[in-house]
Regions:
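Membrane-embedded alpha-helical bundles that constitute the cytochrome b-like, heme-associated redox core
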Residues: 1-186
Length: 186
């Protein structure tokens, strides 16, 4: 049987997004909001905005290029679960950076009274969304806390989906002896 692989652009986008998400999920678990963590928080934001751009590219690529079919050996419930997990992964990979960006736009730096800036990798200034301009400090703080909760819960949901995705790939590779990992490699 011939191995049907993903296209090289799909593979590159998959692994770039995967590594970026892995960093941001790990940083979510170990960072706190203090001065020592600020450089890592800034990197977290830069990676999040990068993921947003990469996932948009991935969705456009996928719309124009049909991915390979799942192997015939997949059971119906595995096919259904695979489609559900992939759909939710795309949703969360898009929602996570977007919710972080909106949350940052609602933030106020204690020293300046302005929203925290986002400078992608300390090189490219990125803009905050004007959704909260003119809003009083208490309302902004309330939105920032609410959006922080949404971003945090979404992070846990994304982590669970990543575990399902990786677990499914490893199950098919090692238990079912299918060349699952080779399909998403160069």
């Amino acid at each position: 049987m011939t191995l049907v692989k993903y296209t090289k652009p799909a593979v590159i986008l998959h692994w770039l997004i995967g590594v970026a998400i892995l960093y941001n999920l790990i940083s979510m678990l170990i960072l706190d909001d203090n001065a020592r963590s600020r450089p890592f928080i800034e990197l977290h934001k830069s990676i999040g905005i990068t993921v947003l751009g990469l996932v948009l590219m991935r969705v456009l690529w996928r719309a124009a290029n049909t991915p390979p079919s799942l192997p015939d050996s997949y059971k119906p419930w595995e096919r259904t679960l695979s489609h559900i997990v992939h759909g939710l992964l795309y949703l969360m990979i898009f929602a996570m950076p977007l919710s972080g960006w909106i949350m940052n736009s609602a933030s106020l730096n204690k020293n300046t009274g302005l929203p925290y800036s986002i400078d992608l990798y300390h090189i490219v200034p990125w803009f905050n969304l004007p959704l909260f301009n003119g809003m009083d400090i208490a309302a902004r703080k309330g939105w920032h806390e609410f959006l922080g909760g949404v971003h945090s819960l979404s992070g846990w949901a994304l982590l669970a989906l990543v575990v399902l995705h990786v677990g499914g790939a490893l199950k098919h590779q090692f238990l079912n002896k299918e060349k699952e990992l080779q399909r998403m490699w160069f």
